[in-house]
Amino acid sequence: MSDLSLGRLPTNDSKKTAPDSTTMESFSYDDGIVRLFLIATIAWGLIATVAGLLVAFLLVMPGLVDGLESQVASMLSFARLRPLHTNAAIFAFGGNAIFAAVYYSTQRLCKCRMWSDLLGRLHFWGWQLIIVAAAVTLPLGITQSKEYAELEWPIDLAIAVVWLGFFGGNFLMTLWNRRERHMYVALWFYIATIVTVTVLHIFNNLVVPIGLGKSYSIYAGVQDALMQWWYGHNAVAFFLTTPFLGLMYYFLPKAAERPVFSYKLSIIHFWSLVFIYIWAGPHHLHYTALPEWASTFGMLFSVMLWMPSWGGMINGLLTLRGAWNKVTSEPVLKFYVVGLTFYGMSTFEGPLLSVKSINALSHYTDWTIAHVHSGALGWNGFMTFGMIYWLLPRLFQTKLWSKKLAEWHFWIGTIGILLYIVPIYMAGITQGLMWRAMDDLGRLQYPEFIESVQSSVPFWWARILGGTLYVAGILMLALNATMTWLGRPSKYDEPVYTAPRLSRFYEDSPIPQSPLAGTPVLDTAVRLDKVSAMDWHRRWERFPVRFTLLTTLAVIVASLFEIIPMFLIRSNIPTIASVKPYTPLELAGRDIYVSEGCYNCHSQMIRPMIAETQRYGEYSKAGEFIYDRPFQWGSRRIGPDLAREGVKKQSSFWHWTHFENPSKFVTGSVMPSYKHLLEQKLNFKEIQKRVDAAAFLGAPYDKELTEAESMAQKQAEVFAAEIIAQGGPVSYNGHLIKDSTAIALIAYVQRLGTDLFAVPPTAPPAEKPAEAPATETPPTESATTTDAVSETTPTVA
């Protein structure tokens, strides 16, 4: 509608009755903060993509850093750098792009300067320090191991302060002090982003700290998995989708010089996304130990998401009606068209992948990686590039240095995306088919996991070419931005604008009468017509506090309906009598597993599928994970599943040698050497506080509460003796192997999956009355595996 064109809102649709309604006020915009975020976006975008390129090389060349000192090499491993790449891409590149868009558009849509210049600067520098902290801690192995929420609790606290206090407070106070009566659609999406990310961040990161660099989640196992993917899915929704839709609704009409196609469609688009998106997270956990009702719920809402998502894409593309001739000559519009197209592709593929039968094939494969990158590179990346090219001449008050170079960036970037995602789609589908393939006798056609890895290597090499082209495009952007900046004036012009102060007294225009009124139709039809006209929504748009509360209510209500049953209904996590908490040494080994990022390559979740149970063993049960903080189910299998690794009875010496040189036992392995684990000495003194924290969270420890260190040392001696007896060394790197960090990790790996087949502890016999004669009780038969497990799930093909 034309009243929403180019970010301008109507001011004459209602009458103002206050005597001060014509009071004019002068103001200027704070474009300095936008320049800062824009420069940071380009810089971090280059760093994030170069890091991704390095990670891609490390996957196919695991020995790339072997020449370095082992401790340095450990910080540059694939498993340590992959979370760094994802965090840099999302929160550094994507985050700074969001902030640049919000600070630029909000001031113009509200006809006022940001409420506080100081909060804006605190926000900028605080966010950059958070990114630097992530860049330091993640390679050091300081991580929570939750996707998109890897950062430890001190950084999480800083994020909460910077996001809600500096950014959210500044934004909401700007809305409160605006000089434009109605809030434009872009502002709605910004509100939803700020509110929902706050809720997600706080409740997913509730932990018990045991030090500055380590904490345990208050959630365990299945509940932790549900909370993580409630957060993980909606982090994509409300950090990588809604703010970029706000960006689209402001900058696309500006660039096209056309009004937004449909105001009504934008209303439907917004509220549908806000309400439906929050329910969809459990579709990431199909066929896992999560109760089936929860994952089915997630699937249904994911499928429903397709319609409002495409409503937004259509609204964006049809905004270009009458302006398609400009697309051929304007690189900004080219970026927006392709970005919106990738948004449409991703929001179709997402619901598709949520369907259980398709997810059974795609989950844990590179198909998910291709899906994520088509959205990140195509939607988020190209929408950001379009915004940057549009802003550069306006912020630096000079002509864009090279329009031709921007064109080259577009074409090279587009080709790069295609060369990246197509091979990875092929790799993912190939992996899924090979893992499930059975011969005529019902046996695995590819019994060795390494066969699927070797088939993927050519595709992994091909995606490096695509990634290189994408990085080359960002280098072109950086050059163009730098040269444009060098052509800036010696002093920026800062125009002063005037606008009337908003009156505190306001009378809405009456809602127009339905054209069906007075016609021979039911009263219900007249009321429905008035509702569908959506004039009522115009009233909501002038109340930022009410609008924010309604958005918050929609998000919280949807979340509670999903989360509360999982925590209150005990049958969701049936008890397994034989499951016991980890020993002190195993608990330390589990923390090493988390620190090394093993979850990036290995899952610990065997799905109830014939091919998986033949390959890995008995499928996983919800009750097995009640002491797992955080859960380690993983989302990708570059290596085999480890949920039953302890049941395989692999020797401890095999694991020791495998950590030192993985390819010695598995030819063609892409696992790097973990020699540093053999060289490092385990800090036994720190184990006690880990046990104390686990006990505080419910682990039923007894003498471990006072003897954790000595118990860990005794168990380490047992494993060391076993390794030595099997031909291993007595000492390594100047210390006895019983003191090695690798011993703790081996203890943990050897424990995995064994509880399900253990004999459950028996209750002590009740005391007999003193006067009763002593009688001999015959021995009872040991509990079988079936007795120990109190839950069943049908196995599916």
Where are these regions (language model features)?
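Short, Lys/Arg-rich, polar N-terminal cytosolic tail immediately upstream
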Residues: 1-31
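Hydrophobic cores of alpha-helical transmembrane segments in multi-pass integral membrane proteins
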Residues: 2-3, 35-142, 153-175, 187-212, ...
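Short pre-active-site segment immediately N-terminal to redox-active cysteine/selenocysteine motifs
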Residues: 585, 594-600, 605, 638-641, ...
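Surface-exposed patches in mature extracellular/periplasmic domains of secreted proteins
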Residues: 601, 667-674, 756-765
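Post-cleavage N-terminal segment of exported redox proteins
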Residues: 527-582, 713-722, 748-777, 787, ...
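Electron-transfer interface patches adjacent to heme c in soluble/periplasmic c-type cytochromes
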Residues: 551-556, 614-741, 796
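The canonical Cys-X-X-Cys-His
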Residues: 589, 595-604, 655, 745, ...
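Electrostatic cytochrome c docking/interface patches
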Residues: 570-594, 608-609, 731-738, 786-787
